[in-house]
Amino acid sequence: MTGSMLDIRGLTVDYVTGRGRHTAVNDVSLAVGPGRVTALVGESGSGKSTLGQAVLGLLPNAARVASGSIRLGDLELLGLPERRLRTLRGARIGLVPQDPTGSLNPVRTVGASIAETFRVHGDRDHAKIRRRVLELLERVGIDDPATRARQFPHELSGGMKQRVLIASAIALEPDLIVADEPTSALDVTVQKTVLDLIDSLGRESGTGVLLITHDLAVAADRADEVVVLRGGAVQETGRASEVLAHPTAEYTRTLLADAPSLSSVVERRIPDAETARPLIEVQGLRREYARRGAEPFVAVDDVSFTVAAGTTHALVGESGSGKTTTGRAVAGFQRPTAGTVSVDGIDVTALSGRGLRDYRRVVQLVYQNPLASLDPRQRVGRAIEEPLRNFGLGGAAARAERVQHQLEQVALDPALASRYPAELSGGQRQRVAIARALVLDPRVLVLDEAVSALDVTVQAQILRLLARLQEELGLTYLFISHDLAVVRQIADTVSVLRRGRQVETGPVERVFSAPESDDTRQLLAAIPGTAYNDETAHEAGTEATR
């Protein structure tokens, strides 16, 4: 095959609503060659997902293609009737979506989900379909395909579910795969495995890949060409190695400067973790869950660490490593099976009733998804005020004044108090969640993947906010994350967990530069972004801040 598999020229897409016309994609051109990966990089609202929807013929009703061309080989896609587009989806264009849990039917086995791809395209040979399903599951690296084909999505890990979606996407050997944030919800080791799979499938079969991502490190590792979008317009395009090593657009330099790096640390004036008194002490923590007819499942097994007052301790590991269970035990939401948790001299494991309720004023949780943790029917101001009402603190006027103070403290306009969560951006919602957590003046924040769902620029802003709040308020953080580059920037000490056990703990500098455990080394090796070095990113950051 020669030429471009996908050729987009001068594409403009508008959204027409009651409020008027909004241009989501503005005069965008790009190409994807056979066996090549083109990465479409940008923040939320950059237009990258709208462009992907346009390629698939899945634009929402409010969207209008104002101008341009989308060609798949020699076929012009724009203007094709829906019936024709349906035959192309799956057969010539495959989709790997972001959320495997939301994309798979929970009441259908994974084998049936893959088989549906064949049936939709007219294949009725059940024996042949079953053989192909098992072949596909084996091809994407799923062990024991016959057993897995009979399982339901909830019985598979996130990485396995994403492999099932890839199997569906390649079932009919399409010319093009649109991979829309295919690994943003996955841990680094699973992410590497899934990206390796997409990469190898493309190279083996000559399939082109349009990789939609906000992760520059993923683009650096996997793409042949990069297109950087902002506000629907192309800021920069070219070979990935050139764009990321020598960016010409100011916006690209800003993205590179904001990307977390394993070799750089954000300087923070905080107490020395070695000499400051321990505020959090966890000793021999164990948490079991009973299982009918089987041995208990051990989620956390003999985890111990201390966190000095005013410092940040990170819990790092893959899904199922026990890091969230450990964090919830510190926050008082999980009672350990064995071991002790002490915070500011309080034995958390002995608390119940009123004592446990009062403990909520000492430790607060900040979750990964603020949209899920904030009541969508409750205005922002009311959400921040709610903990004060629950504890009977202050009158209405004093609470309103405190809400204004909290919004200002997290660098939000107090006028946002009258908005609903859905009316805010992801970064604004996370700031609201932090403001709500701080309204009771806690000593400790447990931050559970608090920045993992955010674009790189917004993520950098939230990390800077957390560093400032720690310095101003003397806060102690327990920072739960699967992103080691982020941990490198914010944490003083770290515990690496695997399958419930602590495999390594110590100062971040030592653990990351001279890891003692093979598990830690594997986590570090799986981090994307080795295609361009941190020195280049530093140079880009220097240029961006001049």
Stretches with model-predicted labels:
Residues 77-94, 120, 126, 242-247, ...:
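ABC ATPase NBD coupling module
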